[in-house]
Amino acid sequence: MFFTFLCTSLAFNEESLPSGYRNIKLGMTLDEVKDALKKDFQFGYRGERDVSLMPDQQKILIETDTSRTAPSSFLDKCWFQFYEDKLYIITINVKPTRMDHYSIFSTLSKKYGNPGNINPQKSEWSNDSVIMTLERPLTLKYTDKKVYEKLMEESLVQNTAQEMSAQAFLEGL
């Protein structure tokens, strides 16, 4: 009985996982992210020159760099990946001269509980909609879990078709 109460209390003390950092949230459109980046100098966004179309044609990438535009920021380089005009991955490199891995890990563990998956390279928290990862040396990543799983499923189907084509080619030799 006490154990159940303790677990329930701990669960309510932990915050739900964030869907992004500052005013940039997973699921935002490309234009919404551009507008939010323009208003927040911490990311070092320089406008359209930071936006590129990935070879896949359905994916757009925004890459920011604070080295020239926001040297006092805790952030270094950041990447914002879109699929079907929706933000589905936020990758933030934190400056190791301004912050350390242990401080971020401790803060995240205190706010969101222990990571569900941990190894020497990364710590991962997740729920039904978000995967939040702290990677070494100092990268924080927010991923839309549903979009990620959909893309992984699609890539497995494509690999299977490619494997079948390769097998057919080899059989024809």
Model-derived segments and their meaning:
Residues M1-C7:
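Bacterial N-terminal signal peptides
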Residues P55-T97:
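Mid-chain, structured segments of secreted extracytoplasmic proteins
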Residues F12-D56, I89-L173:
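Non-cytosolic coordination micro-motifs
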